[in-house]
A protein has these predicted regions:
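HhH-family (HhH-GPD) DNA N-glycosylase catalytic core used in base-excision repair
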Residues: 1-287
Length: 287
């Protein structure tokens, strides 16, 4: 077993992180102890990492421990997932001078948390397309518990190779639509065959990521934007077509009707170069 202690030099709202992550029944969280167990797959090894917050918003500190895994590689991934690589003060100061200031006062120093796995991020995006959040959450949980693996009470998403071999009929029996079942299996096959290499696009420009993902059935602009935001941690994404974003903007600005594209574009420009944080806090405002 190994463990590491991390102290951040800037404010960080870990309680808000755990609160949002607790909406997903697949996440193993102990809110009272400020603990989450993170499933990581590094070099084809499944690793359960225990993360505990032991500090405050103004003085954030963490204990990270695991029974397995290369500590250096695990810590590199944990820093990326939980946004420990970049101070928030510049982001916070930027939004305190925008029309979204009230949101950034309410949810101050809440980071964007990445999906624990790139393939899982794309799978989740496809499952969540065009259905309500509650049903999407149920479908995702059932899917992972049926095809994924469990280690120490923590569930790991299935690998692309496993998903590639699921039959469409089997997914249809689990209330997936015909088209969505085809998208899920097709994505697994694209990665398993080497047609799509998710590791290779981590550092590529947004246009290059889009060029590789959009030809795959079931992946459109909304999915690419969400993957860039929650899979790769890009800071300047603002999915204007997202219904939740539209509802949130309508509420924040007290509009009679949903905002049109011109209004959303104006909000987006005001938020640059940190649009992803605006999107996150807008979503939080309607949770």
């Amino acid at each position: 077993m190994w463990s590491e202690h991390v102290t951040l030099e800037y404010p960080y709202h870990f309680e808000e992180v755990l609160k949002r992550l607790s909406f997903d029944p697949l996440n193993v969280i102990q809110l009272d102890e400020k603990v989450i167990y993170v499933p990581l797959c590094i070099d084809e090894e499944q690793i359960v990492v225990r993360l505990q917050g032991i500090g405050t918003v103004q003085n954030p500190q963490f204990w990270i421990s695991s029974q397995t895994g290369d500590p250096e590689k695990v810590m590199k991934r944990m820093r990326a997932i939980f946004h420990w690589n970049e101070p928030f003060q510049d982001i916070q100061n930027h939004f305190l001078n925008t029309s979204l200031r009230p949101l950034f006062e309410t949810y101050a120093y809440t980071p964007i948390i990445l999906e624990f796995d790139h393939f899982a991020c794309l799978l989740r995006c496809i499952i969540h397309q065009q259905i309500n959040l509650k049903f999407a959450t149920v479908l995702t949980e059932q899917f992972v518990k049926r095809y994924g693996t469990e280690k120490n009470g923590v569930f790991f998403f299935p690998t692309p190779e496993i998903v590639a071999n699921i039959s469409i009929e089997e997914l249809r029996e689990q209330k997936f639509s015909q088209r969505k079942a085809e998208y899920i299996v097709g994505l697994g096959r694209s990665i398993a065959s080497g047609t799509l290499n998710l590791a290779s696009i981590e550092t590529k420009a947004e246009e290059e990521v889009s060029a590789q993902l959009l030809p795959i059935r079931g992946i459109g602009t909304w999915t690419v934007q969400n993957f860039l935001m929650f899979g790769l941690g890009r800071k300047n994404m603002f999915p204007k077509a997202d219904i939740g974003i539209q509802r949130a903007v309508q509420g924040v600005f007290q509009l009679d009707d949903k905002p049109d594209d011109a209004f959303l574009e104006k909000v987006k420009q005001e938020c640059e170069p940190y649009c992803s944080y605006a999107a996150l806090y807008l979503w939080k405002s309607i949770e």
